[in-house]
């Protein structure tokens, strides 16, 4: 199996233009994407090695210990003994990177060791970044390997809301009612509403206002009023009827007996008592009638017991 030697791009004094030419040449090369890996903290740590997933390593970078050389599937660069291979890659600027690739029996993993730490430092890789590997297609790019990377996606800005404290409960002992604490009101972040014309306007505001992402808007929901319990006060209805009954009983009753109208006191409610009192009054008045001289005194005495109305 023959491999095309990779000639690194020539660096001149004003290396900026050469880098641009290398990037342009790298972009026009037809490449096949092989695999990519999200680097872990151990991949960019002090171990100075990159672990290649086993399925990708055996497919694209197989090791042939018997032949002492490898590079199936487009492995580029020189070979090595039983210690592994040296693979050469090109980045997007056309710069060549050489990594020692081998198999570790202790961890049973395929790793890239020598040269990897320099790539991490120069590209400033961090945990979560993605490293991708590719190979050239066609006669012009056959046997060339490519390496690239991209930064991890920044997490969407999370809104930190201050904790909402429930308002203190107030109790009115005079009215015997208690107000429970109101539930906390959720906060909603400021949202940008875009009209059909493409302008961003804050909700409820005119054009030209651009709300900041750090602002917040409070949306208050109507609260259901708490139930109020009043202390019941007993009402005595019997008092009104007693007053009405007392008013009716204070009126004197008039009875006509033997042609005489008698006004009896209100305390005598029983008919038998009224009749007995009337008969006694009539008898006493008849006994006093023959004495003309005592008519005045008898009438005065009769008024004390009950008023007489002689209808004779």
From Swiss-Prot:
SMART domains: B3. InterPro entries: B3_DNA-bd, DNA-bd_pseudobarrel_sf, LEC2-like. The keyword DNA-binding applies. Residues 286-301 have a biased composition (Low complexity). It is found in: Nucleus. Coiled coil: none annotated. GO terms for cellular component: nucleus. Residues 161-182, 286-312 are annotated as: Disordered. Residues 170-180 have a biased composition (Basic residues). It comes from the Eukaryota. GO terms for molecular function: DNA binding; DNA-binding transcription factor activity. The keyword Repressor does not apply. This is Putative B3 domain-containing protein Os10g0537100. Keywords: DNA-binding, Nucleus, Transcription, Transcription regulation. Residues 35-153 bind DNA. It holds the Pfam family B3. It comes from Oryza sativa subsp. japonica (Rice).
């Amino acid at each position: 199996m023959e491999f095309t030697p990779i000639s690194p791009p020539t660096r001149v004094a004003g290396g900026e233009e050469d880098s641009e030419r290398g990037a342009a040449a790298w972009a026009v090369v037809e490449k096949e994407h092989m695999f990519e890996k999200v680097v872990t903290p151990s991949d960019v740590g002090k171990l100075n090695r990159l672990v290649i997933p086993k399925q990708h390593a055996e497919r694209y970078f197989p090791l042939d210990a018997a032949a002492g050389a490898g590079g199936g599937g487009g492995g580029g660069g020189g070979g090595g003994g039983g210690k592994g291979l040296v693979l050469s890659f090109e980045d997007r600027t056309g710069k060549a990177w050489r990594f020692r690739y081998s198999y570790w029996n202790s961890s049973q993993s395929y790793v890239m060791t020598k040269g990897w730490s320099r790539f991490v430092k120069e590209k400033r890789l961090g945990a979560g970044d993605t490293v991708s590997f590719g190979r050239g297609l066609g006669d012009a790019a056959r046997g060339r390997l490519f390496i690239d990377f991209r930064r991890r996606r920044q997490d969407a800005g999370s809104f930190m809301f201050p904790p909402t404290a429930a308002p203190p409960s107030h109790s009115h002992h005079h009215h015997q009612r208690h107000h429970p604490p109101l539930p906390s009101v959720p906060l909603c972040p400021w949202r940008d509403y875009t009209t059909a014309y493409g302008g961003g306007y804050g909700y409820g505001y005119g054009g030209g206002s651009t709300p900041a992402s750090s602002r917040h808007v409070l949306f208050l929901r109507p609260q259901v009023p708490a139930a109020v319990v009043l202390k019941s006060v007993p009402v005595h209805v019997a008092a009104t009827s007693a007053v009405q009954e007392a008013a009716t009983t204070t009126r004197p009753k008039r009875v006509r007996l033997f042609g005489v109208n008698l006004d009896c006191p209100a305390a005598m409610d029983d008919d038998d008592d009224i009749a007995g009192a009337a008969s006694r009054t009539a008898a006493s008045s008849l006994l006093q009638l023959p004495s003309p001289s005592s008519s005045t005194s008898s009438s005065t005495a009769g008024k004390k017991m009950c008023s007489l109305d002689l209808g004779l």
